[in-house]
Amino acid sequence: MRATTLLSSVVSLALLSKEVLATPPACLLACVAQVGKSSSTCDSLNQVTCYCEHENSAVKKCLDSICPNNDADAAYSAFKSSCSEQNASLGDSSSSASSSASSSSKASSSTKASSSSASSSTKASSSSASSSTKASSSSAAPSSSKASSTESSSSSSSSTKAPSSEESSSTYVSSSKQASSTSEAHSSSAASSTVSQETVSSALPTSTAVISTFSEGSGNVLEAGKSVFIAAVAAMLI
């Protein structure tokens, strides 16, 4: 049964190709039989169209390996002529499978690329949100309240000085007001408190001079009183 099918296949190839009728290459018949045994698509040896469309490369490879001299080219030309007589295109099932596999691998790689870009954009948005949260949480600055409390304590201590230093204390009050109006700048508060300390220290010699003058005046009054008292006692004795 198998021999009858092979014979019918050979006859059909010989009838379909004029070149085969003239010089029938034996290697072409052998290659068709060999490829038909190992083919999973073409299950019959007389299906010329099946070999043309699905086993073209297998037939060509077989012809190049077993046909001597230049018979491989002649045999392949006869095979193509048979395919054109059947209006069959030359193709391969293995090449179509490999092309579909490559297209599926390209699709999977593009899917991976899109998913990785989506994850990277998500990471970027979350990091920007966390950085904005940190920036908003660090916007508070408690240094202004400390500066104002220091200024108030300095001004209260300056009010206990001698009355002769009123001008300097008023100057200190005005400078402390200027410092409190600019309490947002820590360096300006420090500079104004330094000026206030220098003003208070300059007021101290003035109050000391007033106290010493008052002491000298008190001594003169006591001496004058003693002189008057001695004169009165002398007058009474006389």
UniProtKB/Swiss-Prot annotation:
<feature type="propeptide" description="Removed in mature form">
    <location>
        <begin position="218"/>
        <end position="238"/>
    </location>
</feature>
<dbReference type="GO" id="GO:0005739">
    <property type="term" value="C:mitochondrion"/>
</dbReference>
<keyword id="KW-1017">Isopeptide bond</keyword>
<keyword id="KW-0832">Ubl conjugation</keyword>
<keyword id="KW-0134">Cell wall</keyword>
<keyword id="KW-0732">Signal</keyword>
<dbReference type="GO" id="GO:0009277">
    <property type="term" value="C:fungal-type cell wall"/>
</dbReference>
<feature type="disulfide bond">
    <location>
        <begin position="27"/>
        <end position="67"/>
    </location>
</feature>
<feature type="cross-link" description="Glycyl lysine isopeptide (Lys-Gly) (interchain with G-Cter in ubiquitin)">
    <location>
        <position position="161"/>
    </location>
</feature>
<keyword id="KW-0449">Lipoprotein</keyword>
<dbReference type="GO" id="GO:0031505">
    <property type="term" value="P:fungal-type cell wall organization"/>
</dbReference>
<feature type="lipid moiety-binding region" description="GPI-anchor amidated glycine">
    <location>
        <position position="217"/>
    </location>
</feature>
<keyword id="KW-1015">Disulfide bond</keyword>
<keyword id="KW-0472">Membrane</keyword>
<feature type="glycosylation site" description="N-linked (GlcNAc...) asparagine">
    <location>
        <position position="87"/>
    </location>
</feature>
<keyword id="KW-0336">GPI-anchor</keyword>
<keyword id="KW-0325">Glycoprotein</keyword>
<dbReference type="GO" id="GO:0005199">
    <property type="term" value="F:structural constituent of cell wall"/>
</dbReference>
<feature type="signal peptide">
    <location>
        <begin position="1"/>
        <end position="22"/>
    </location>
</feature>
<feature type="domain" description="CFEM">
    <location>
        <begin position="23"/>
        <end position="110"/>
    </location>
</feature>
<feature type="disulfide bond">
    <location>
        <begin position="31"/>
        <end position="62"/>
    </location>
</feature>
<feature type="disulfide bond">
    <location>
        <begin position="52"/>
        <end position="83"/>
    </location>
</feature>
<dbReference type="GO" id="GO:0071944">
    <property type="term" value="C:cell periphery"/>
</dbReference>
<dbReference type="Pfam" id="PF05730">
    <property type="entry name" value="CFEM"/>
</dbReference>
<dbReference type="GO" id="GO:0098552">
    <property type="term" value="C:side of membrane"/>
</dbReference>
<feature type="compositionally biased region" description="Low complexity">
    <location>
        <begin position="93"/>
        <end position="203"/>
    </location>
</feature>
<dbReference type="InterPro" id="IPR008427">
    <property type="entry name" value="Extracellular_membr_CFEM_dom"/>
</dbReference>
<dbReference type="GO" id="GO:0005576">
    <property type="term" value="C:extracellular region"/>
</dbReference>
<feature type="disulfide bond">
    <location>
        <begin position="42"/>
        <end position="50"/>
    </location>
</feature>
<feature type="region of interest" description="Disordered">
    <location>
        <begin position="91"/>
        <end position="203"/>
    </location>
</feature>
<keyword id="KW-0964">Secreted</keyword>
<protein>
    <recommendedName>
        <fullName>Covalently-linked cell wall protein 14</fullName>
    </recommendedName>
</protein>
<comment type="function">
    <text>Component of the inner layer of the cell wall.</text>
</comment>
<comment type="similarity">
    <text>Belongs to the CCW14 family.</text>
</comment>
